[in-house]
């Protein structure tokens, strides 16, 4: 695992790890750039602490640190901390204070993330051998070169980790994820969206045996995003549900192998879910909606977009039992009619956001039920609803004064109707395809 471009000194030091001529550590507010002439390789530039003091306007960072008044929410990001460490010896010591390293954020498709994590965690472990007690968040989304080795570094060195985002890192596998959730008992937020090799979330065999007093064989994750984990099946979802019983937010978008049976397992164990997305799960039907309805008033957010097997029957289950629903995305559910919208409007009166685009059987009648019952509606999408006319829109605008977003693209709506909406809902942004209205 040697790297000819690695320049290592005997003194532990800050590292800037990035591909040449491209951003390294990213946070949306700037990035470091390489001064190395080496090309075609990911460069890890390692520096010893500067021997002299330099005068710099950023000295206020030192005074804040000395007074221990630094605001945690305003801590410098990864790239800036590494740059600060190169100013002088005093700043070097300040920049590597573990209290400043609550978060590590790395981005870039070509960055050697495994090496970066190894160097960073090694330096942050100087005061507390082998562990980074202050590190709570690691975000390495989109880093395609991240492998199981990098995740194992996190699992070994970050026992206090609470948030991990590795979306789009398609080289990581189940084993690495098992290590993280087993060795980081405080982990609450996990994003593995786009990690196509991840098919399950569970404890390692060793953790199940040795750490049962600590875990109770449970994982403390509350937020789990498995969007685009195409290989996830009902059996894997069963295992996830059995181990992650504290889940409140679960996103299974485009997990195309999930069926109603998987949702049945989920509702047996995870009874505290507030937000759930099964959009584009084509095997989910009205029977799955019956299972989801068991969440009752706890459910606030539900996305069933493009689940073509769901009809008014499934909507009726949700409307009857999930009365506190605030958000529903049913775009592309072509089996939903005005009857389904009626059930929804009369029972979920606190609905704030509704997407029934591409539901050709929904007409002005359904809109009238919405207008007369859901006065708090703020966002409404009717895109490509062929049966909607200007009359239905006018009824909505006359009753839902707080409407802030209306999508009527590809709908047969007149200019007069759009002007009526704009006149009554002054803060409403209208998305349309009528060139005569502006």
Where are these regions (language model features)?
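Short helix-loop-helix/strand-helix junction enriched in hydrophobic and basic residues
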Residues: 81-98
